[in-house]
């Protein structure tokens, strides 16, 4: 029971964390471009 619950939590959090990392990296990249310009 606990293993399935943990696996479900990990599978549910993985895409959210990946999306957060991508969004933060994209925002930082855009900010750097604006500062360079």
UniProtKB/Swiss-Prot annotation:
Subcellular location: Plastid, Chloroplast thylakoid membrane
Keywords: Chloroplast, Electron transport, Membrane, Photosynthesis, Plastid, Thylakoid, Transmembrane, Transmembrane helix, Transport
Gene Ontology, cellular component aspect: chloroplast thylakoid membrane; cytochrome b6f complex
Pfam family, one: PetG
GO molecular function, one term: electron transporter, transferring electrons within cytochrome b6/f complex of photosystem II activity
Transmembrane spans: 5-25
Record has Translocase as a keyword: no
Signal sequence segment: none
Membrane topology type: Single-pass membrane protein
Reported function: Component of the cytochrome b6-f complex, which mediates electron transfer between photosystem II (PSII) and photosystem I (PSI), cyclic electron flow around PSI, and state transitions. PetG is required for either the stability or assembly of the cytochrome b6-f complex.
Known partners and oligomeric status: The 4 large subunits of the cytochrome b6-f complex are cytochrome b6, subunit IV (17 kDa polypeptide, PetD), cytochrome f and the Rieske protein, while the 4 small subunits are PetG, PetL, PetM and PetN. The complex functions as a dimer.
Family of the protein in this entry: Belongs to the PetG family.
Protein name: Cytochrome b6-f complex subunit 5
Top-level taxonomy: Eukaryota, Viridiplantae, Chlorophyta, Mamiellophyceae, Mamiellales
């Amino acid at each position: 029971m606990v293993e399935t619950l943990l696996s479900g939590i990990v599978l549910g959090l993985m895409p959210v964390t990946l999306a957060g990392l991508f969004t933060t990296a994209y925002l930082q990249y855009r900010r750097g471009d604006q500062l360079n310009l």
